[in-house]
């Protein structure tokens, strides 16, 4: 389930109206939600962008164009439901009647919620409060943290434990990653308690200033010398697994880990340039790997995409048509990126008025009553689930069936307004899971709830593409390269894109679950049966959007969301929720969401019809108030189910599936040859942007572990990465470089320069080539080096090569080297130049 708080809606309070809050991410807090990726566009022509946006059938043919389908911790859960060998399931009605004791109240609305901490799993709101309380209970119950409760040291240890917990570490135990890494010799001993204190201290140290590189020596400063071994262990683990010193701060981007001293670094191909692929590629490059990213679309980001919308009179806005709301910034790695990039965050305000079809606000008392009833229905389902497990009965039934049966048993929402309000909450739940409630597993649909990140939900001004472009900067990405098959064996991996093949030691597949379900990529040998079954069992759902840029904000500046009710339960998910992005997008932007069954029907409609329907709903709300709803100057309609690079929006736990399937999808195949990342491989944070991000970090660490194991056992000659004959590699690389330098960006004397593609920043890197002449005029030696764009321009302005060589040596301390001696950063630069050149050939 998406970790965005979509199951419940805060009560609208008059005193909250008019508030506007912009939040900066606090020291230990970071962000994410995952929705979808590419879009179809509804655009008026230049003459119609002012006020005459016509939606008549005749004009729609002229003024509407569609986008092409280019393509998007372990903290122990409170209760883990394990699948059991069970007898055939009973009908839901029979199970519910058996589960109701004589003491059960038939009045679901007036029943008081139990405060017993040992009661069955509560509903979404109570579940969050209880888990937060449990954090403190764990700390107080742990001798390692309660020894000095009244001292400043004790308080600091407690504070650091909470920061580590927000990142996903349990308070008094190790994560599975730490156990696999053998961070302590004895599980549960004194060393473990001390290690945890040291680990938490290092995390808190770096989180206090995420723009700096935390050194091992700095971590040692406040820890006694006898614990140096623990510091080394914790520091190495946190560094290599991406819990510290990660992100986009300049000092961090420039840092390089010495992971392969004395041996040739392994070669990794990353399939997909979504968040998971970008994060993994950047992390692997920093570790010293040779990396190439293959992306089928003509842009990075995958299901995270921001589109610039514009109209007449200079009206424009940035619209997130994919991942949009940053859900919970506490401990979220995207929050770290926001701090490093100096990005302010806009808190999504809790006010969410719900409008009846006639434009009137829903009755506040009825609204509150039904919201409470909805939460208690979920509580009942949780209690039923627990009792069925205890009685060894099958719980493999649809969530929607159980909710509807309970609704009938307790007589919830019997009049029309109550039913409309309940349907809105059910649509909201379908939004959270990107599917119909009838597809969700009652047993495991909310298996990720114990891991939800706390903190505010936020928008980022300018859209989430800011993260994407910053992560993709200077990465060697080949766009327009759709992977068709992956062959793997004991000697490496072959990745095929059309008529091209890429040889590598290891490959990381980050494509969405929908692509795996569709079988768009063939694997040779076939994926293990267990993995193929998990791919089929897990659900991959659909959410769509209509983004509309208006000439003015007619809905008001005091709210970020509002909803609309419908009398027809079958259309409850059709434009049921609107997000206002006026405060962060740069213009009057409104986004309507389409969830559940409506999201599937939406893809059968034309963009024109969809926009007409949204406008009909908006005018039904605002015209009775005397507010004119103008035509939008531009609109975008998503089509995620039809996108061949995603085939849907995000994952969910379907009937017959469980959280175990996320873990199975995350498993590598071929004895550490092909790895998998993406939100659908993250059991704790599926269906979120931060889940995709963390999965990329996880797999970078796994690839490093396997590479070290392979190097130490000499299973593969580290100098034989791609091709058997080293001479052939050198000759091919020389030919590639000659082709690149046929059209240099600058040339002067014996010097040629190639700038970083798509960047005119003075400090962006440039590849410098110098020809050293030999005795014969026709012969010579090419040497290479890296300089900034500004330095290259300064070189060109100098008088003669002698001064230029002196400038390189004396001022820059640079000695050009042969191609084979070029640094890892230089290799990455060459890969970026190749990718850019290939893209120009494909798209120009």
Swiss-Prot record:
It holds the Pfam family SWIRM. FAD binds at residues 295, 297, 303, 679. Disruption phenotype: Up-regulated expression of GLP2A/GLP5A due to derepression associated with hyperubiquitination of the target chromatin and H3K4 hypermethylation. Its EC number is 1.-.-.-. Residues 154-255 form the SWIRM domain. One of its GO terms (cellular component) is cytoplasm. This is Lysine-specific histone demethylase 1 homolog 1. It comes from Arabidopsis thaliana (Mouse-ear cress). The lineage of its organism: Eukaryota, Viridiplantae, Streptophyta, Embryophyta, Tracheophyta.
